[in-house]
């Protein structure tokens, strides 16, 4: 229950709340466990899939597994932790069923959405919050502990809402960061670009390393195979970890390597070697090398090498038109 001071606006931090979660997926169950550690009571969760039910029983053993509408009706803090594509439909359904009481704190965990998606419930007296953990969740035990190192993008309707969201995030061990409603999509795109695409980059590099390391090795050397955590990953890990650390701490000065140096011959050789291994992997290398070259403001000849055939064709046509104009 929210304290009387919070209602008056003098102390907006939430007291111990009765929490309901829809649904008990990777994110919802992890946040629920973190809220319980802070002293809140997660009375109930909804879970449809076997995996969600298992996570609920494992991470939140004292919580009942209930239909979403019943969870919503009984909650003082309702946490909507469903995929982005399902959020608007869930909110609409709860509003139509009149399942959320006035005064209920309703928070969703979507990165791309602000509080606008909660408008049907806000119109019925709910207090809307967007609380997105900038963290990847695997469903394993480390999810909850990782929240202690995570920032949360929060959006609210007013100062009271921001204070409540901030307090909840701090209680879960995270760091709250204010994100304007109109910037939520950009915020989410940036995080997806820096995390999801990083995984693809690493997997591509591992694939190329496996091909490069295949064949006879040193006495006692681990054989190269397709299993995660193998030799290719061990070779790449220190370099990739150092590169990420340098990029986060030093910015553009962390750029090194043949693209940053403008070494056309080395990059051309890389492209040829990668093409013989996997054309799609080579295309990814070309695209990222071009972006790297643009950031490094490197050798124009390298930019020309890395430009796509259509870009080179457009540039040539533009040059021809300029000559004709003269």
Feature annotation, model-predicted:
Residues 29, 33, 37, 58, ...:
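Short, well-ordered alpha-helices that flank and scaffold nucleotide-derived cofactor binding pockets
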Residues 1-73:
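NAD(P)+-binding Rossmann beta1-loop-alpha1 motif at the extreme N-terminus of oxidoreductases
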Residues 2, 13, 234-326:
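NAD(P)-dependent Rossmann-like dehydrogenase/reductase catalytic/cofactor-binding core
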Residues 50, 54, 58-60, 64-142:
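Rossmann-like NAD(P)(H) cofactor-binding subdomain of soluble oxidoreductases
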Residues 2-14, 97, 211-230, 312-326:
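Intrinsically disordered, low-complexity terminal tails and inter-domain linkers enriched
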Residues 18, 40-44, 75-78, 102-106, ...:
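Short active-site oxyanion
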Residues 38, 56-59, 121, 142-246:
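Internal alpha-helical scaffold of NAD(P)-dependent oxidoreductase catalytic cores
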């Amino acid at each position: 229950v929210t304290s009387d001071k919070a209602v008056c606006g003098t102390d907006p931090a939430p007291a111990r709340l009765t929490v309901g979660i829809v649904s008990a997926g990777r994110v919802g169950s992890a946040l629920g466990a973190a809220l319980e550690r802070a002293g809140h009571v997660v009375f109930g969760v909804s879970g449809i899939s076997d995996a969600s039910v298992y996570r609920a029983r494992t991470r939140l053993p004292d919580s009942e597994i209930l239909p979403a509408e019943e969870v919503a009706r009984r909650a003082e803090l309702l946490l909507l932790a469903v995929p982005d594509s399902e959020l608007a439909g869930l909110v609409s359904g709860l509003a139509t069923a009149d399942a959320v009481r006035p005064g209920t704190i309703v928070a969703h965990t979507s990165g791309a959405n602000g509080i606008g998606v909660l408008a049907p419930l806000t119109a019925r007296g709910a207090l809307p919050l967007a609380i997105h953990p900038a963290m990847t969740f695997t469903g394993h035990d480390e999810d909850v502990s990782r929240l202690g190192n995570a920032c949360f993008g929060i959006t609210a309707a007013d100062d009271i809402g921001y204070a409540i969201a901030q307090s909840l995030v701090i209680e879960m061990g995270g760091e709250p960061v204010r994100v304007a409603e109109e910037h939520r999509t950009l915020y989410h795109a940036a995080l997806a670009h820096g995390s999801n695409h990083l995984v693809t980059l690493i997997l591509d590099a591992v694939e190329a390393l496996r091909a490069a390391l295949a064949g006879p090795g040193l006495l006692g050397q681990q054989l190269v195979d397709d299993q995660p955590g193998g030799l290719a990953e061990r070779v790449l890990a220190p370099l990739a970890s150092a590169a990420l650390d340098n990029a986060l701490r030093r910015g553009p000065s962390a750029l090194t390597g043949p693209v940053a140096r403008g070494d056309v011959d080395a990059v051309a050789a890389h492209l040829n070697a990668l093409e013989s291994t996997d054309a799609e992997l080579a295309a990814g290398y070309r695209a990222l090398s071009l972006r790297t070259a643009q950031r490094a403001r490197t050798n124009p000849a390298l930019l020309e090498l890395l430009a796509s055939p259509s870009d080179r064709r457009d540039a040539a046509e533009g040059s021809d038109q300029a000559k004709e104009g003269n």
